Amino acid sequence: MQIITAEDYRLYGGLKRPELESGVEVMITAANALITSLLGMDDADAVDQLITTKPTRKKYFLSSPSATSVTKMTINDKEIDPEQYKLYSDGVILLKFNPPEGYMDVEYTQGGFNPMPEDLKLAACMLVDHWHKQDYRQARTIGGETVTFNNTKSGIPEHIRTIIEVYRRV
């Protein structure tokens, strides 16, 4: 999923030149891939998900909150008419009947964020900046003095990870 483009990073950094420093384009691609992975999303458009059904439940959750449409739904090998359920924009399916106990197979298409949240774009830009400035180093020498500091476990600074966690899918 493309979270930021080179143009977004230029805007974030206030850069006037059309070209970026070497390696920044690769860092942008890597930041997009890493954040997409941390969000629990993938780039596949078509998804097939198996969900356990209970007769007392009518509300079910898809693993992707960006589901745009259900292409096919079956419960215990019986196809369900689209009039019998509703897909909400946050990936929730509400059935209009009590399903039998068993399994619901949902085939759906997913999209990304539309539009991309500005704070998520900011997190991606800050991550590229973090890598570009090599802020991940454990020690720095400033004015003859060496300062040592702890790295984060994930390699992503806490303030960036906090933004990503808001949109993370479990």
Swiss-Prot record:
Location in the cell: Virion
Keywords, in A-Z order: Late protein, Viral capsid assembly, Viral release from host cell, Virion
A Pfam family: HCP
Superkingdom of origin: Viruses
One Gene Ontology cellular component: virion component
GO terms, biological process: viral capsid assembly
Function noted in UniProt: Head completion protein that closes the capsid once the viral DNA has been packaged. Probably part of the head-tail connector by binding to the portal protein and to the tail completion protein.
Name of this chain's protein: Head completion protein
